From Swiss-Prot:
This is Probable E3 ubiquitin-protein ligase HUL4. Belongs to the HUL4 family. Gene3D superfamilies: Hect, E3 ligase catalytic domain, Hect, E3 ligase catalytic domains. CDD domains: HECTc. Residues 31-40 have a biased composition (Basic residues). It is an enzyme of class 2 (transferase). Residues 55-70 have a biased composition (Low complexity). It is found in: Nucleus.
Length: 892
């Protein structure tokens, strides 16, 4: 048998002057990084009918299993309607067609009869393995070393030496079934086949470190042919039923790098051809995965929720980079037209805009440092238009199937992430895409809200003709991609419109009835009975809740431009959480508050309570705080916000609220000995401390109350078989059943405020908590960021002596003092959810001379007023007096 090494030596000796050129058996149809034209001539292998929006063209194939030609007299009743498996575009074609091509994404679909006797044992055992590749590569390296010793090594011979690697890859990557059997590992005995991502990464790493690019490029081209010509069985409802092969292709390393334009990269595997083919793989993998059937999508979700965190995060990042890439193309085209006259390169203009964006205090809009920030460093070609005129309009992406498919697939990953309990779930920030901060969110939101409120007539018009129609797209349908900053902007936009509408209606009513109708929702309260006065005003003005809020404190000067409103929220929540009210209990072990199980004077049989209306008041207050962009000082667990967002609760939520009890429950669950009942001796009951007994020390009530968790629970012992059910009912009792009347009253007040506000649906529980409570800092505030956005009034500047002293003093203070200062200036010791750099902070000069007076604060405008004090020590002393001895509007 003649080896490859002998053949190469034979060429040197002149015995065999021919060198095989069959290095690639598969070719890529499109190697330029652009969309293929719909009218482009197909290759001989993909002659098919081009189908789009119900139009078909007759074609013939030169293959043995040729597609049936379509007669122009085909009965229209035999037409099949479906969405493209890759791009989702609606298609209609005759049932007799066995091969068709979508002219939008250029994918050819071959429909074949299912194989009845498919017992091809020789092929069912073939799979792509790391060991197989290592063996082939090792032999090729041995041949390479021997060839180096002969001194006849050149580029062409080096490529021929690694021809066995190319053959191995083409044999494995040409078939979907082979790829689906490759790189598998079983997950914990649950009979779920998972991809072994560690092995897969090592597999690609070997290919990336070969001395030639040809094997890697051959694999890419083979994958591209596989994705461009998909074969499905007739009995599968024309759907893709397998997904693992798509994940294998999606994890090819150059798919990520092709979405980042790094012009300084010296990697030999980042050539233009490799980047172009890698992009083709990216867009079709994302397209196929986003259009899987419901059943297959559920299987994909089950697989993703068990995927290692690093690999899961990597795939989410690819989706965000892909969206960035699509918007960069939109922006590049626009900037090319704008900069042509000025002879400025679009890439330079975009990078300039990106640098300006990252120096204007808007870093909070995205917390994804990898995909968002690395793009700038590596020259991704995308920048963010800081000019309001430079917004992505809705029509630019409304019909873009690339963006649609990426958003749909990101939704699948988001759902999988919510189910990754104990498996390293990503935070919501990992799904944020900073690019979307620069869409025209008003158009997008109006379109989304318009679709949600579409009339029956419009629906009938769309369905006329009984044709397959595409669903309307809007990024508001995928809110997890939108950053918290743009969601807040959307909410402020809707709230502003609602308030303007309410004010307009009040004005029209006043004209119609000839009497004065207030355009504001005014609340007049006394500090000592703030809860009673607030509840009375809210009850008397139920129809005014959506108007702009104005607060007035009795016998106190002050016009509410925002500061009085903050003060009212702060004092009212403090009053509602007063332990003597008995509305909420404070749990020391978790430092969290929760609804009291037995509020004072609560009659369970009638569901009435003299103080139950205060829960309604608290719900209204929380809603008004969001509605009026005010932060509340609350210490609720995540369970409350999950309940508000209709998200399922878990044992982890109970653990956050009652950590000590949850540890004991876990110990019970982990106990597996046979003497379980003798050791624990428990029944389906729970005992809690009576809140009324704590408040009133009443002899008529018991200190502890025992409740059955199920029917006849006192006689149902806890065993090894039902201990999980016991824990489930225990958690359900404390988080739901025991507080149901109180919570229902609270949520009715909350929903009363947001009855007409759709934007609240954009927030999940994590974001809602930040929206209500702000961004909680653990140790110190970032006053350097605040200083960078501070404005100076009255003669002060950033380098003024008193100003420099001020910043030095507050940065040296401990956290409690910093909170007091923030409370003094802004009427809240919390910073906004979007970060401290978004506070419109001001420092103004009261007088150019020294003074013994204390500093002043205008909480309506987040402004502190300083005298030009003579020394740093004096300034610090005056600040301490001001923040510790002030309350209300006037010193006491």
């Amino acid at each position: 048998m003649v080896s490859l090494f002998d053949k190469l030596n034979a060429k040197k000796d002149g015995r065999d002057g021919s060198v095989s050129k069959e290095l690639l058996s598969h070719s890529v149809a499109h190697t330029k990084n652009r969309l293929p034209k719909s009218g482009r001539r197909t290759s001989e292998r993909s002659l098919a009918a081009s189908v789009k929006d119900g139009s078909c063209s007759n074609s013939k194939s030169n293959k043995r299993n040729s597609s049936a030609s379509v007669s122009g007299e085909e009965d229209k009743s035999c037409l099949i309607s479906l969405n493209c498996l890759c791009c989702g575009v609606p298609l209609r074609f005759p049932a007799s067609i066995t091969k068709f091509r979508c002219s939008a994404c250029q994918v050819t679909v071959i429909v074949k009869e299912p194989e009845i006797n498919s017992n091809l044992e020789s092929s069912t055992h073939i799979s792509c393995t790391l060991e197989g590749l290592q063996m082939v590569v090792r032999r090729c390296h041995d041949d390479l070393q021997r060839l180096k010793k002969t001194g006849i090594l050149d580029k062409e011979r080096k490529g021929l030496i690694f021809q066995p690697v190319i053959t191995y890859l083409l044999d494995r990557f040409h078939d979907v079934s082979i790829l689906n059997r490759s790189f598998l590992v079983h997950d914990g005995g649950k009979n779920i086949k998972m991809l072994n991502y560690e092995v897969l990464q090592r597999f690609y790493s070997i290919l990336s470190n070969l001395p030639t690019r040809k094997p890697y490029y051959s694999m890419l081209c083979c994958c591209n042919d596989l994705l461009k010509r998909i074969t499905i069985n007739k009995g599968e409802n024309l759907q893709i039923l397998q997904y693992r092969w798509l994940l294998i292709i999606l994890n090819i390393p150059t798919i990520r790098t092709c979405l980042i334009r790094d012009r300084k990269s010296k990697n030999v595997f980042e050539t233009q051809q490799i980047r172009a083919v890698s992009y083709e793989l990216a867009k079709r993998c994302i397209g196929y995965l986003s259009n899987l059937s419901t059943k297959t999508s559920q299987q994909l979700i089950q697989s993703l929720r068990r995927t290692p965190t690093d690999n899961f995060s990597y795939q989410v990042e690819i989706l965000n980079l892909y969206i960035n890439f699509q918007f960069s193309r939109l922006l590049s085209n626009e900037l090319s037209n704008r900069t042509a006259k000025n002879n400025v390169k679009p890439e330079d203009e975009m990078r300039s805009r990106l640098r300006r964006h990252h120096t204007t205090g808007h870093e909070f809009l995205s917390t994804r440092p990898i995909s968002a920030q690395s793009n700038d460093k590596q020259g991704s070609g995308f920048t963010h238009p800081v000019n309001n005129k430079m917004k992505f309009k809705f029509f630019q992406y409304e019909e873009d199937w690339h963006i649609h498919s990426a958003a749909k697939l990101t939704f699948i990953y988001y759902v999988a992430n919510t189910r990754r309990n104990g498996r390293g779930a990503l935070s919501i920030q990992s799904f944020y895409n900073i690019t979307l901060d620069f869409i025209d969110y008003k158009q997008d939101f109006d379109h989304w809200r318009g679709v949600a409120q579409k009339t029956k007539m419009n629906q009938l018009i769309e369905e006329w003709g009984n044709s397959t129609t595409k669903k309307c797209f809007s990024f508001c349908k995928y809110p997890f991609i939108l950053s918290l900053g743009i969601k807040i902007s959307i909410m402020e936009y809707e709230i502003r419109r609602i308030m303007e509408h309410e004010a307009e209606q009040a004005f029209l009513i006043s004209l119609d009835k000839g009497k004065s109708v207030d355009v504001y929702f005014k609340i007049k309260v006394r500090r000592d009975v703030i809860s009673h006065d607030s509840l009375r005003c809210i009850k008397e003005h139920q129809g005014d809740l959506l108007k702009s809020l104005r607060i007035e404190f009795v016998n106190e000067p002050g016009i509410d431009a925002g500061g009085l409103r903050k003060e009212w929220f702060f004092l009212l929540t403090k009053s509602l959480f007063n332990p003597m009210n008995g509305l909420f209990i404070y749990i020391k072990e978790s430092s969290r508050s929760w609804f009291a199980i037995d509020p004072p004077n609560f009659d369970k049989s009638k569901g009435k309570n003299s103080q139950l209306e205060l829960y309604y008041l608290f719900g209204v207050v929380m809603g008004l705080a969001i509605f009026n962009s005010t932060i509340l000082d609350l210490q609720f667990p995540k369970a409350l916000y999950k309940k508000l967002c209709s998200e399922p609760l878990s044992f982890e939520d109970y653990s956050e609220l009652f950590p000590e009890t949850s540890r004991n429950l876990i110990k019970m669950l982990n106990y597996t000995e046979d003497n379980f009942e003798d050791v624990f001796s428990l029944t389906f009951e729970t005992t809690y401390r009576n809140n009324n007994w704590i408040l009133n020390d009443s002899k008529s009530s018991k200190e502890y109350v025992t409740v059955e968790l199920c029917e006849n629970g006192r006689n149902v012992p806890i065993t090894q078989s039902n201990k999980h059910e016991f824990v489930m009912k225990w958690v359900e009792f404390y988080l739901e059943k025991s507080i149901e009347p109180q919570y229902n009253k609270f949520v009715s007040g909350f929903k009363r405020v947001f009855a007409e506000c759709n934007s609240i649906k954009l927030f999940n529980s994590e974001e809602l908590e930040r929206l209500v409570c702000g961004d909680e800092e653990q140790t110190k505030f970032d006053f350097k960021s605040l200083r960078s956005v501070t404005k100076y009034v009255g003669g002060f500047s950033d380098d003024s002596r008193a100003v420099c002293w001020f910043w030095e003093i507050i940065e040296s203070w401990d956290y409690p003092l910093q909170k007091k200062l923030l409370q003094f200036v802004t009427a809240s010791d919390r910073i906004p959810a979007t970060g401290i750099s978004t506070i419109p902070f001001k420092i103004s000069l009261l007088g150019s001379h020294d003074s013994d007076d204390l500093p002043l604060a205008h909480t309506c405008f987040n402004e502190i007023c300083l005298w030009n004090y003579s020394s740093k020590k004096k300034l610090e002393l005056k600040l301490l007096w001001a923040i510790n001895e002030s309350e209300g509007y006037g010193f006491r």
